[in-house]
Amino acid sequence: QKGGYDTFMQKEMHEQPYVIKETLRAHIENDLAMPELSGLDASKINQIYFVACGTAYHASLYAQYILRTWVDLPIYCISASEFRYGNYRIDENTLCIFVSQSGETADTLAALKLSKENKAQTLSVTNVLGSSLARLSDFVLYTCAGPEIAVASTKAYTTQLVLLACLCLKLASLCNGVVESQNHMIDQLKQMPEVVEEMLQQEDKMAEFAKLLTDQKDAYFIGRQLDYLSVLEGALKLKEVSYVHADAYMAGELKHGPIALIEKDTVVIALATQPSVAQKTISNILETVARGAKVILITSKNQNTEGFDYVIRIPDVNPLFSCIPATVLLQELAYYVAKEKGCDVDKPRNLAKSVTVE
């Protein structure tokens, strides 16, 4: 049932504060005890792989990024469809982490089987109890997103982000990593349900911004560092539900080719939520404005936004977690572009909820 919402996708976007709270309750109470990992031999781990497809791959890129900030180990993130055929040196000293909403993604399952053949420790993050991924892995952590009916993932993705953040904190502890303040990080994560709720209250504003894209064939997303990972997911969502061609670029790469695509009235969606690189990103964005682009800017509360007409701000959160509220805004944008165009947002053409074929 849609519960009074127009679509399942909209309903599931609005369920995010609750399911994030449930996921956090399941995994960060009792000081990140995570008894599901009690048999993990951290002393053997000398490299970590995150392996996934699609939206789950974007969540895995996020996990790779934050774990690298805390742990001095080689940490990789590989698309499952590539992992199977690449020359990756997997052995008994490897931890392979597989992320899949359904737990039935064919390429991810094949990658898991390959890892087990090479004696790696395996851990899955999935939303479905008893799924193939869960049954075949040595260890499993569940997101608490509940059933997700819409093909385009929303609540499953944000619960993956928060669970992977919890997992990375736990792995940092197990692998002698350095976290500036674990208690602060946990407190910040506990604020995410309220932060996401605040973003959902910006729905009308994102619906207005969506009108900029209704007649566009192309859109360009840019960001740096974690913002780049967020725009990868934002571009995918826009493609999935509205059929607008969307590319995501590292902001610093604009001048190496993509800026040739920018002309009058081109729509650029830009993220600048990372304090260490925000000003450089703003400089890159202004280059697109100078060429006539219309820019939708998602940024932090204190960022100077002079020169931009379409601005939305996220609350003050730790920069490592800013992608969570930013992602919700990008979901809303994609949703309302699709609605304006009359697309079937719950069942986009040519897509399946669970990709069980290679």
Language-model features: where?
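Intein/HINT protein-splicing elements and their conserved insertion hotspots or analogous self-processing inserts
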Residues: 1-17, 21-22
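Generic C-terminus detector
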Residues: 2, 317-358
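Active-site phosphate/pyrophosphate-binding segments
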Residues: 15-49, 129, 139-267, 339-358
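Extended hydrophobic-aromatic, low-complexity segments
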Residues: 59-60, 76-77, 106-109, 208-209, ...
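Short, conserved micro-motifs enriched in small and acidic residues
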Residues: 54-58, 154-161, 225, 229, ...
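Glycine-rich phosphate-binding loops that contact phosphosugars or nucleotide phosphates
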Residues: 44-191, 271-315, 333
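Conserved phosphate/anionic-ligand binding catalytic regions in large, soluble enzymes, centered on
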Residues: 5-9, 54-63, 221, 228-240, ...
